[in-house]
Amino acid sequence: MKHTEELLKIDTVTDTAAGNTTYLFQNDKGDAKITVHTVFPGVELIYNSVHTDRFHLGSKTEGHLIEIHHCREGRIEQQLEDEFFYLMPGDLSVSMRSRRAEEYRFPLRHYHGISIVINTEESPKCFSCFLKDVNVQPEQVAKRLCGGGKSFVIRSQDYIGHIFSELYTVPESYKKGYFKIKILELLLVLSGID
C-alpha cells in the first residue's frame, strides 16, 4: 500500500449548539480528530487526538499568532524556523508566529493534547479588564516568555497540569464559559513566570 504523506480530511462535523467544529483526517499511517472551539473572537481552544506519524494542518490562518500547546499523552515535535522543540506528557509550549505551523510530527504515533491559538489582531487586547486586580494581555505574556526567540517550553509542572486536567473533563453543559475562565487562568499563571 502506498503511503500518503498528507492526512486526507474525511469528514467535518459542526455542532452549532456546542460552538465547535470537529475535523476527521485519515491516511494509511493513521488518523487524527481535531475539535476546534471558538472561545473569544480570535481565540480557539483545540482538542487534538492524533494516531499517525505526522500531521499537515494545511491552515491558512495568518496574523500575529500565539500558539500554546499542552501534551497530555504521547509526544509532539515541531519546528519553528531555526528552532526545534518537542513536548512530552505534562509539557507546555508558547510560541509566536505570523502563521499557523503547517506540520507537526508524532514519533510515537500517539498524541493527545490541547492547543490554544490566539490571533492578537482579532482577539480582545485585554482578557481581564473587567477584573480590577487581574491584568492579562496575551501578546505581552507571549513576548515576555519568548523573549527574542519564537518559543518557550515549560517541562511538566503540577500547576500547569492542574489547569489542563480540568479542561479534559469539563461537562458539556458549561464548556463554553469554562473555556473562557481556564484560558484567563492559564494566561494569568503564565504572566507570573519569571
Report the location of each language-model feature:
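N-terminal low-complexity or simple alpha-helical regulatory segments
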Residues: 1-62
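A generic short-segment signal for beta-strand/edge and adjacent turn/coil regions
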Residues: 13-19, 34-41, 80-88, 133-135, ...
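Hydrophobic residues positioned within well-ordered beta-strands of beta-sheet architectures
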Residues: 46, 66-68, 114
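Residue-level recognition of well-ordered beta-strand positions that form the cores
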Residues: 49-51, 69-71, 117
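Glycine- and acidic-residue-biased ligand/ion/polar-headgroup-sensing regions
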Residues: 62-82, 92, 120
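Alpha-helical bundle regulatory/interaction domains
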Residues: 79, 86-194
